[in-house]
Every structure is written in structure tokens, then in C-alpha cells.
From Swiss-Prot:
Summary of the function given for this chain in its UniProt record: As well as its role in the urea cycle, may be involved in tissue remodeling.
Protein species of origin: Xenopus laevis
Cross-referenced NCBIfam families: rocF_arginase
Name of the molecule in the record: Arginase, non-hepatic 1
InterPro entries, A to Z: Arginase, Ureohydrolase, Ureohydrolase_dom_sf, Ureohydrolase_Mn_BS
Assembly description: Homotrimer.
Catalysed reaction equations from the record: L-arginine + H2O = urea + L-ornithine
Induction notes from the record: By thyroid hormone (T3).
Gene: arg2-a
Amino acid sequence: MSIRSNFVRLLKKQVSIIKLQKKCSHSVAVIGAPFSKGQKRRGVEHGPAAIRSAGLIERLSNLGCNVCDFGDLHFSQVPNDELYNSIVKHPRTVGLACKVLAEEVSKAVGAGHTCVTLGGDHSLAFGSITGHAQQCPDLCVIWVDAHADINTPLTTPSGNLHGQPVSFLLRELQDKVPPIPGFSWAKPCLSKSDIVYIGLRDLDPAEQFILKNYDISYYSMRHIDCMGIKKVMEKTFDQLLGRRDRPIHLSFDIDAFDPALAPATGTPVIGGLTYREGVYITEEIHNTGMLSAVDLVEVNPVLAATSEEVKATANLAVDVIASCFGQTREGAHTRADTIIDVLPTPSTSYESDNEEQVRI
């Protein structure tokens, strides 16, 4: 092989390594948020531990990410946390938890990390998105969920704050959201054009009214059936990134998946995303290069019927997060020493030895 061809081969190898390092050099902060007071079912506070036990940190490290594990946050129960309006449960406790999480997410994003928040229930998204917006005020949100979580404290049929975080986030709804205890620190940080829903299939009447009358973009499971997930993602990016690149916050509720895939969750709804659809969403978000923060919420190990259901749900959560950071279904070969830019050929001596053995 000539000196020139050796040089070209070495140069190609170096270019491949540089491209790979650029692609896989995510600095990822993982924040555990073991919180359950945004809803009534016990066990979702064990979600972070279940996802960690399924190998999240190792998976991200193997993808070439520099992982900074911030551990689990501590959330205090506010004493005498009375109902608001005779229905909204634990407002002070939820408000305080979201404030604590917002501060931690802001710190992580401000330090240059892509932030992964492990829930916990989905009320936490108010905190994670608020904290993210403190560092990236032009962010946009992709909300993957069976539910819209956009009730207000005055429309909620359950009183559970995990069904209300988006109403607190949107500027257009602030004249409909009363100043409830625990949220005096909070300010809306999104406009209606900054969010797109994917996977909806269980809406309350007030939520249907809000989505329609405030012209908020969403793609229900029917839309996905009719259009296909590829078209849904194209339209999502057209809206959120069509005019400019900006940071993406992905808030992913595990109940977006069909319960056959993710049984260990508190509000399962039949007819959800397939594995392929869910992972396609996160693969495409990764491919934009604009992902800045991820929530993975509502994994509840206590509600699983068997240990296998816990494992299946937690493993699915890990796959969702890993595909946000470059895991592909073709296989993720991320280490520089595994790059192959040319296939090996047999040496002359090897061929001669084989010929000699045949003659013998």
C-alpha cells in the first residue's frame, strides 16, 4: 500500500473520529425527582430508582455521553397542605417541589448539560420546564402523553396537579389560572405556539375546549394512525423549528405508550404508541441536534402486576432516553476504536499457507 493511500486512509479515520466525538459528546445531567403528590397513587416516587436499576447511567455512558448524576432530590411535605377550592390536592407541596426542581434544572442547563429529569409524576414538568426556560427563554416543548395535562385549577375534575402543569406554563391561559398557594414564585414561560402534543387519546371536556379554542397544536393517536409518525414529526418540527433553531424540551410520559408495553404506570389508556412510534419520535428529536432537556415521568413500579412488568416498563424508559442521545435501532457503535472504514483483506502469506495446506 502506497504512502499516499496510507495517509488518505488515516485522514479518513481521523475525520470519522472527529465526527463521532461531535455526535456523541453530550454532557448529560441526570436528576432524580422521586415525587408523587401531584396525583393520588403511591409508587411513582420509585420511578427514578426503577429507571436507574434498568441501567440508564451505563447505557448513556456506553453511548459516549459524559454523565453527571445529580442524584435524587429531596422533596418536603408541607404540613397542613389544605385543598385549594375544595378540590386541588397538595398545592403547596407540589409548588415547592416544582420550585426545587426548577432551581436544579436551571443549574444543570446553565452548566452546559443536557438535563434528564426522572419522575415522579408529571406535575414536575412545570418545574423542569420553568428551570430550563430560565436559561433558554426561547425553548420549545414536545409533550408526548396520553393526556394533555392542561386542566386549570378551576376545571380539573380530579384535583390532581399532574393533570394541570401546562395551564400554568402558557401565557395565554394566565387569566384562567388563579393564584393558588405554593405557586406565587411561578411565572408562565411558554406561548401556545411553543408546544406540540403527540399521542393524545384521553382528554377531559375542558381540555378539549382549551386545545380547540386556543389553537394549540396536537397529534392524537388518530392523527398518528392517519398520517403516520413520520409526517407527525415533520409537521412538529415545521412548527417549532421552521423559522429558527432553538432548544427542545421533551416531556415524555410513559403512558404515551400502549399499556401492553408500559403496564407499570398510573393512568394507562389502551391504544397508545407502539415501540417503533415512540422511539422514532426520540430518534428524530436527537437528529435535530437541538435537544436540551428531557423529562421521563410516571413510571410506577408498585402498580405492576409482576416484576417482569416493572422491568419491561423501566427498560422502555431507558430506551426512550437512550434514543434521545444517539442510540439507534441499527446499533450504536460509538467508541472510536470500533469505527470501521475499510474491510480487512487476507494477507499474501495467509493465502500461501492455505494453498500449501490444500496441496498436502
